[in-house]
Design a protein with these regions (language model features):
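Hydrophobic h-region of N-terminal signal peptides that target proteins for export
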Residues: 2-9
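Solvent-exposed loop/turn segments connecting transmembrane beta-strands
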Residues: 22-34, 66-68, 97-108, 136-145
Length: 156
């Protein structure tokens, strides 16, 4: 049994064919919510995926509450999984990337650490590079500003 346990190694990114799922908290100015993402490895250091989040708690603006469209976001993304490039422990991965969403074209930087082969934690920060609307005001700032995500990561 001891030999079998020692052969199990947690690995944050395995390369082509690797599938990751993440769920966590989304934190941004005047709003907090839930974050989901999925990534699929297409090469040794590349993955494509999606993210979505929904703000559960938002600040009223001029007495109005944010509606579903203000609270929801969906993005397609590309990651460069660089843990092995930086010679990090196999349990760790650093992944900068680009994303194209409902509100902007942006960039993100994330970090994963796996405790077991199936479970780990992640943190990720993102910001818009180009907003689709130059006159952003009120609820348009939601999901269109600096965001921070933190939570659990899973090998699927």
């Amino acid at each position: 049994l001891l030999c079998a346990v020692s052969l199990i190694q947690a690995q944050a990114y395995k390369g082509k064919g690797d599938i990751k799922g993440q769920v966590g908290a989304n934190l941004q100015d005047h709003g907090t919510g839930i974050f989901f993402s999925g990534d699929y490895g297409v090469g040794e250091n590349m993955s494509f995926g999606f993210t979505t989040n929904y703000l559960l708690n938002t600040t009223e603006i001029e007495g109005e509450k944010a509606d579903f469209g203000d609270r929801f976001d969906l993005k397609a993304r590309f990651n460069a999984n660089l843990g092995n490039v930086f010679k990090l422990d196999k349990k760790m991965d650093v992944y900068p990337g680009l994303d194209l969403g409902l509100r902007n074209f942006g960039a993100h930087l994330g970090f994963r650490y796996f405790f077991t082969d199936g479970f780990g934690i992640f943190s990720e920060a993102g910001l818009p590079i180009a907003k689709y609307d130059e006159d952003v005001y009120g609820f348009d700032h939601y999901n269109n500003q600096f965001v921070f995500n933190i939570g659990a990561s899973f090998n699927l």
